[in-house]
């Protein structure tokens, strides 16, 4: 059944806006903010520059919109893990899995995060920075729950957050390098994320447990 012309016209602005966002994510991830040109975005999205400026105001406005939207969805996903009904050990395992799943499902996000880190966060507005600050309190809540349950010892939430986030960011972002190393026959680095997730779960739990040699199932 053909969509009525009036309905198609209502959908067109939404579709164009979503296409601009998709193209912009790919370009910002591949080139960074400074090297991305509005002309390129408009050409690849098949819109004129005026429409892009109409929706987002400027290249910086578009970039901030994407970053804020991505961080907001990321933090919401991690908040779900922290607030779920589960033991602290289960939550730590799920936290690692959620990090890996989210950064794999949204491959432009780790690249944009690493580029922004290299730029000193110069393009992050106050609202986005505030949203980023929720990760450490969430990690702290997992540690404190484990301490109340008698299974975790003392641990620094900032260090744990950087260890888990940094490791996962690096693993997901360097997939093309691992693939090329395999193709050249220099080594056989893993391409699948499941073994990485499993190992990072065990490392995290072992570092947190009062008795690191006392194994618990994390399935």
Q: Which residues are covered by each model-predicted region?
A:
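Basic, helix-initiating cap at the start of DNA-binding domains
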Residues: 1-31, 35-46, 60-64, 72-73
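Short hydrophobic/aromatic patch on the recognition helix
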Residues: 45-56
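Amphipathic alpha-helical segments used for helix-helix packing
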Residues: 104-126, 174-183
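C-terminal peripheral helix-coil segments that are non-catalytic and often amphipathic
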Residues: 1-4, 101, 105, 133-149, ...
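Amphipathic alpha-helical linker/stalk segments
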Residues: 66-94, 124, 142
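Short coil/turn segments at alpha/beta junctions that flank glycine-rich nucleotide-binding fingerprints
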Residues: 30-34, 85, 106, 149
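Hydrophobic alpha-helical connector segments
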Residues: 79-111, 157-164, 194-197, 219
